[in-house]
């Protein structure tokens, strides 16, 4: 209790610092893809001491100092490990180069990660010769290790950086000529792109791989390995996909199904980073399009900025990548002069926080490694612990190369803006915004895809209304529910019914299960004049069948139940009301809903009402379901989020019934208004 009182008390130091702060900012025009309400400052005029206590310790230092003082030494230790153990390298119990490791990108990530040791040293450095000889030996050693797609890009990027720095020339190059000749054949985008079939992606790869293929083709051209035709064709393929499947400037990760997530915000940043990296010139028309899309991503990111360096909070492939995605977009936007001068300062301050969070939270000093997999953390199965070395190096690469852009713009030794000034800018951002991704044309067959952002002071809450599409539509990181760092979260690859009901039919055979996902339309928002209250509504003309006959990887439209949904956001409280209507009598065996929370010490108050004594959530109540129980889930890996373990779950259900009349399910979630998400769970 004492710690909580301390967090919720205004410190004299914080008040004095704020009084002295200057500057600030405005949310500004959100562009055609979004509608914004008035400033979030309306809900929080003061800053709690949380801001100073819960931001990363190093976030007030120059980003480049974090790179040289913290990150490069981490890479150096990993380099020594690989150099000493070779293909038998073991990190945290993982034989990283084992044939069955599952890391299909590792040689490329090794090449790019360890290249920074050479690129940041000189012949006078005591370890220079060790780096040079070790890099050459590792390149020889990994030549036959599986390396696909992203790994091919990372390797070609590393070679181009080394070539520009002169490390591929002379009597003792960083890569042996014979090995380089083999790499020329192995590092080819045609391995995963069907050039003869209009440059179609092979094996069902998601559309962000167009950017990967383009990057490889362009780098091969710069290395003198092929002509420019491949990169030019792939660039146009990528731009055309954007034009076709991004009506509001964000890339659908599928061909029109409506999966808008971290990649949708990031992809335009990746495209610009590859253009910058390879000095690729595009037509004036394409440049205007690309800059416009980049600005759209910047506008979404601005709404989500926070003191802790936390990034995207819903969808797949989060963990540390959720944070670095913002760094990649913002550094590209700064380089291309898409940001105002004030925005550049704010973006740099946030990027520094991301870097500080990485070395203070994601990096586990006891492990000597990044940790995205244990101690309460969990990520998508395809980013399993078998990829531990590669994930260390690719994330380090993202921080290092974006830092290089900041250095090139004069930020090398610059401290970020002071915390009070940064916070003042954040408090002037809009309280709520609807960012449109797709739909909104009023057509009966169209489903709306968008992202609602609600800011309660410095607390950022997301409401994604998207389609997880193939594989992900039934997993709760894509549910249309609130997400907020260290308060409300889904869990990678899990399907338990977080904050939305799951209907199980009483049919024979495999029970059919429906959830309210994938088919939202008429998405609308309405905010109060002061921006403190926000109402969000939509309807569904069908639910998504996620189990039983007809279900599968793709969403399955089941019209036996339709629904209408209303969310009400206000400081300290979120309310959801759903009305489900059957098309005739339906035999239901059960309806279930859960609320998995970081809060604990739960007290049942009766009538399906609960209070919490510890954590940012203070209360939860539900109507429309009969029975609720409380479970301790702190040791259950199915409740491990990217950042840490959920502690409790309130599990509600109703027994079998004949579903003939509309059913209303309502829940109210109360939380500490003005609470601030730390860079790590409390």
Listing of model-derived features with the role each one plays in the protein:
Residues 1-10:
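Bacterial N-terminal signal peptides that target proteins for export
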Residues 98-120, 145-165, 206-223, 259-265, ...:
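An alpha-helical repeat/solenoid feature that recognizes helix-turn-helix modules
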Residues 9-46:
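Bacterial Sec-dependent N-terminal signal peptides
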